[in-house]
Amino acid sequence: MATIGRRAYAEMFGPTVGDRLRLADTGLILEVEADYTLRAGSYGEEVKFGGGKTIRDGMAQAQHSRAQGAVDTVLTNALIMDAAGIVKADIGLRDGRIAAIGKAGNPDTQAGVDIIIGPGTEVISCEGQIVTAGGIDSHIHFICPQQIEHALASGVTTMLGGGTGPATGTLATTCTPGPWNIERMLQAADAFAVNLGFLGKGNASLPGALHEQIDAGAIGLKLHEDWGSTPAAISNCLDVAEATDTQVALHSDTLNESGFVENTIAAVGGRGICAFHTEGAGGGHAPDILRVVGEANFLPSSTNPTMPYTHNTLDEHVDMLMVCHHLDASIAEDLAFAESRIRKETIAAEDILHDLGAISMMSSDSQAMGRVGEVILRTWQTAHKMKQQRGWLSPPAAGQGAGLSSAAGQGVDHDTRNDNFRIKRYLAKYTINPAIAHGISHEVGSIAVGKWADIVLWKPAFFGVKPALILKGGQIALAAMGDPNASIPTPQPVHYRPMFGAFGGAIAKTSLTFVSQAGLQAGIGQRYGLRKTLSAVRGIRGIRKRDMVHNSYLPQMEIDAQTYMVRADGQWLSCEPATELPLAQRYFLF
């Protein structure tokens, strides 16, 4: 039987089982766990498009029509990186969703084909490229619409949060307050080739004004200290969420005016809640908001300005906080408020808590102390830093926060030749976990059959920093594209340009607007004149930290109020600030 060298095979068809590759300029090494293209029985039946290649009439392209099962688009030889596993496979898309993951080809001439390529099938060649689900940023201040282009260009395809533009309230808090503002933002969402969902304002001691926001289409409610995150407001807001199957996002009381972290935990009363700013400097009860990392009903997340901890982190934060929260440096109390939130000890602990899987999600806090285009980049910088400082990460024992794991990957994860488990843990922080937390995992968050085809392609050398292609609902929405007047697509200047999926009526068919079940049932789509596909959030109120994939660790947390030292299960958490990081200047010379 004819053979081919492993390197030559990888260069032609992409890596296969046992092959390893480096993620950009990080120290993270990925290993392929399984190869679904081998369902044909052996190597040699791979599909590939091009002159003299196999996807031709009568070869790997069948005669099947769409009605006979041919897919709309096939992604060939993709290296799928997902929290559930790292596998090589072909991906078939139909009707804007992932229809199949497996072996593509012509069932009349090939064995094991579960994705039919027909005359009506488009091909996206993924040989040598990494494929991930589109990222989810669940902490968006909708301050300006230009954020959306930057987020999409970074690989984020779903943005959840609140705001109305550069209003003073939105500059500080992620709330779209009231039915009128919610309606306007849902109408604006029709213009953008990303999935959007809006949080109403949850700060109220009576339920009426909160119910009307959910009825208007808000996917949940945001409690922010700048509006008064009192125990009464927290409890009332959660009462409404329980009644409407929506999420509550909490930015708790930094000043401890209306209570301490213990009072907030008591007000939550064991109900599920998204704890935004469960972190070292972003806000919430000072200095011990990290206590909630050990609570089973709190779903903790970080924003990216403190991630990872570097020697520049502390210096930039005071001025940044003063601007974002409408503070005055000439007022001593305002300055003290700002300085109380910025603690190097808790910032350092935040990195380690992410590596332990104790903080479950990453987000941006866009233009309100966070950078909307750097969620993915900073997640992988943190993973790299933690490998440098803490070494190889072993998977936890069964039942200790391991989350999902493909059968193929269970053995590979324990091999010190690769960082597969750490990769899955960090990937889950901005894909499947925010999807689960906000009730949208039935639509997005992973590469899985039936889900919306929000897919990002990466060349390994640019992984995490500059995607090659971004698909929304099965259609290319954004791409790194060369000079449109050139004779081929690659000449300089190459930069991100909107593609056909980002224009006209295609936006409405390829992107989702998330709304409440109450809003969908009330017919807000027709009433507001919305064009986008609407999808209701669901299954939220039973979600607990145990449901956070690869990030469900519940340590006993201790934070010293005087020294700010952080301990998890008795272990002191501290690390040095980074002085140099990957995915940085090397990628942004031009």
UniProtKB/Swiss-Prot annotation:
Active site location: 325 (proton donor)
Subcellular location: Cytoplasm
Residues annotated as binding Ni(2+) 2: 222, 251, 277
CDD domains linked: Urease_alpha
Low complexity composition-biased segments: 393-411
Family matches, as Pfam families: Amidohydro_1, Urease_alpha
Top EC category: hydrolase
Reactions the enzyme catalyzes: urea + 2 H2O + H(+) = hydrogencarbonate + 2 NH4(+)
Record-listed N6-carboxylysine modification sites: 222
Entry superkingdom: Bacteria
The keyword Cell cycle belongs to this UniProt entry's keyword annotation: no
Entry's EC annotation: 3.5.1.5
Family assignment from sequence similarity: Belongs to the metallo-dependent hydrolases superfamily. Urease alpha subunit family.
NCBIfam families (alphabetical): PRK13207.1, urease_alph
Subunit structure: Heterotrimer of UreA (gamma), UreB (beta) and UreC (alpha) subunits. Three heterotrimers associate to form the active enzyme.
Protein name: Urease subunit alpha
Organism field: Verminephrobacter eiseniae (strain EF01-2)
